[in-house]
């Protein structure tokens, strides 16, 4: 609790730095120098942070707060070490994920990581430059990134259920999907408490339509799906038509599908009804592509928030930049990761607020450049559209909070979001590395539990624990 409070205090102070950092004279950045050591399933150790601040005392305050923030969002602290393994999952060979038995289930990792980080100048009384006053060279960042992202997702092949179940990241995908299911379900319920019918949703970066069934189960009335990749949009629309045409199908929402770059194009100009308002905008594993420049990030937020009704929500998942930078600074090179995922930065020590590019690769499924998202900056920018941050948790914090609910726990089992450990005689574990399951083996020895346990391998947990969930509410 103390760590959480400290993290919130740090972010409030950091917002002022974020405002002052973006100026027209030089690129804004913040510098972090950490000495950390690998420990257990994650990274831990004492952190030293160097920032440009006006006094040594304030710098020390920021250092201490960032240490707290890093430890709370990392997976290496002693109190968090067991993470997912205590959850018990019986073997259910015929269980599928929440997305149903359709052969066109969502390829969970069409959605990709993102981040958040630390800030530069700490002088709050210094001139406070408006966020719009971004350096000219930020405005002239190289063209082509958006088309590269679109091309990458257009080239991804649809994979059937059988092949997907054999993937090294099968449980990782299902776990990420469970996180989204719980997040979407929770905020649909909040909307339903305010209005009983005619719920309208904008799915920003819908991919191939992996969340369609979630919206159907949420009994919404209208869905607008947008994505930068035209092939993905066509597959999403086909998946919707397949759902609609099933003989046993219940009522399904109406939908429209738009191919557009939400960071460069104004979506209301493409809506059938430009006056349409939304109750929820969902942006899952997408925000980070927009932080190439201020203009792109602002356009993404405008598209996400401008047409939200008062009391509506902007929800999503995005990488935790504090965690990304912490792991980077702990690495001896400009990259970090394991056999499942890799993150490679261009250099260490200088992390601009916009255009801080890194390459992310996930098991051959995702391989595309992304940009850090400094969350206090995202929070500050969202205020322009009358949005208030009402929820923010790391994936670990979110899991530990939501798994206490029996419905969520049953959904976790149905979706096969955790791997049964130990494997039975007719199956094998997804990882051949013994140390990938040391945490589960240790838990078995120290606790009287019903077997098999449900867990993620160490490698999978390292990959998924770079994310956080968030929700903003539109104010009156």
Swiss-Prot record:
Tagged with keyword Methyltransferase: yes
Regulation: Methyltransferase activity is activated by RAMAC.
One cellular-component annotation, GO: mRNA cap methyltransferase RNMT:RAMAC complex
Composition skew (Polar residues), residue ranges: 20-50
Keyword Transport: no
UniProt xrefs under SUPFAM superfamilies: S-adenosyl-L-methionine-dependent methyltransferases (SSF53335)
Residues spanned by motif Nuclear localization signal: 126-128
EC number: 2.1.1.56
Residue(s) at site: mRNA cap binding: 208, 214, 239, 288, 370, 467
Gene Ontology BP terms: 7-methylguanosine mRNA capping
Record region (Disordered): 1-128
Catalytic activity of the protein: a 5'-end (5'-triphosphoguanosine)-ribonucleoside in mRNA + S-adenosyl-L-methionine = a 5'-end (N(7)-methyl 5'-triphosphoguanosine)-ribonucleoside in mRNA + S-adenosyl-L-homocysteine
Keyword tags: Methyltransferase, mRNA capping, mRNA processing, Nucleus, Phosphoprotein, RNA-binding, S-adenosyl-L-methionine, Transferase
Binding residues for mRNA: 176-177
Residue ranges with Basic and acidic residues bias: 1-14, 54-68, 84-93, 107-117
Domain mRNA cap 0 methyltransferase residues, every copy: 167-475
Subunit structure: Interacts with importin alpha, leading to stimulate both RNA-binding and methyltransferase activity. Interaction with importin alpha and beta is required for its nuclear localization, importin beta dissociating in response to RanGTP, allowing RNMT-importin alpha to bind RNA substrates. Interacts with elongating form of polymerase II and RNGTT. Interacts with RAMAC, this interaction significantly enhances RNA-binding and cap methyltransferase activity.
Similarity field: Belongs to the class I-like SAM-binding methyltransferase superfamily. mRNA cap 0 methyltransferase family.
Identification of the protein by name: mRNA cap guanine-N(7) methyltransferase
Organism listed in the record: Macaca fascicularis (Crab-eating macaque)
Lineage, highest ranks first: Eukaryota, Metazoa, Chordata, Craniata, Vertebrata
């Amino acid at each position: 609790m103390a760590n959480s409070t400290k993290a919130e205090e740090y972010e409030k102070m950091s917002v002022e730095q974020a405002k002052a950092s973006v100026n027209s004279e030089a690129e804004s950045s913040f510098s972090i120098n950490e000495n950390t050591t690998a420990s257990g399933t994650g990274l831990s150790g004492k952190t030293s942070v160097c920032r440009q601040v006006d006094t040594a005392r304030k710098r020390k305050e920021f250092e201490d707060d960032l240490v707290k923030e890093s430890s709370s969002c990392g997976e290496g602290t002693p109190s968090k070490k067991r993470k997912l393994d205590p959850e018990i999952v019986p073997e259910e060979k015929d269980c599928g994920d929440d997305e149903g038995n359709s052969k066109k289930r969502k390829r969970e990792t069409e959605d990709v990581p993102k981040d958040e980080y630390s800030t530069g100048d700490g002088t709050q009384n210094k001139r406070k430059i408006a966020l719009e006053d971004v350096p000219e060279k930020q405005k002239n960042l190289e063209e082509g990134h958006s088309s590269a992202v679109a091309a990458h997702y257009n080239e991804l092949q649809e994979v059937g259920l059988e092949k997907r179940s054999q993937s090294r990241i099968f449980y990782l995908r299902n776990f990420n999907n469970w996180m989204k299911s719980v997040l979407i379900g929770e905020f649909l319920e909040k909307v339903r408490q305010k209005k009983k019918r005619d719920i309208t949703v904008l799915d920003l970066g819908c991919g191939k339509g992996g969340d369609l069934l979630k919206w159907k189960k949420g009994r919404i009335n209208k869905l607008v799906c947008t994505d930068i990749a035209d092939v993905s949009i066509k597959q999403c629309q086909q998946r919707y038509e397949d759902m609609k045409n099933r003989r046993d199908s219940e009522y399904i929402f109406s939908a429209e599908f738009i191919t557009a770059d939400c960071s460069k194009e104004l979506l209301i100009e493409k809506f059938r009804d430009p006056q349409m308002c939304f109750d929820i905008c969902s942006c899952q594993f997408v925000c980070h592509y927009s932080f190439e420049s201020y203009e792109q990030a602002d356009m993404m937020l405008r598209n996400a928030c401008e047409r939200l009704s008062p009391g509506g929500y902007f929800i999503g998942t995005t990488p935790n930049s504090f965690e990304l930078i912490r792991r980077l600074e702990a690495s001896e090179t400009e990259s970090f990761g394991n056999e499942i995922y890799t993150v490679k930065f261009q250099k260490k020590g200088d992390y601009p607020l916009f255009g801080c590019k890194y390459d992310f690769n996930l098991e051959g499924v995702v391989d595309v450049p992304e940009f850090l998202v400094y969350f206090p900056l995202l929070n500050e920018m969202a205020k322009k559209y009358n949005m208030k941050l009402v929820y923010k948790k790391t994936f670990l914090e979110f899991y530990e909070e939501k798994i206490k609910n029996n419905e969520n726990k049953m959904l976790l089992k149905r979706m096969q979001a955790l791997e049964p450990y130990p494997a039975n005689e007719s199956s094998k574990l997804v990882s051949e590395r013994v140390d990938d399951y040391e945490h589960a083996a240790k838990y078995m020895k120290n606790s009287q539990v019903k077997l098999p346990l449900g867990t993620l391998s160490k490698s999978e947990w390292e990959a998924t624990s770079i994310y956080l969930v968030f929700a903003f509410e539109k104010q009156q």
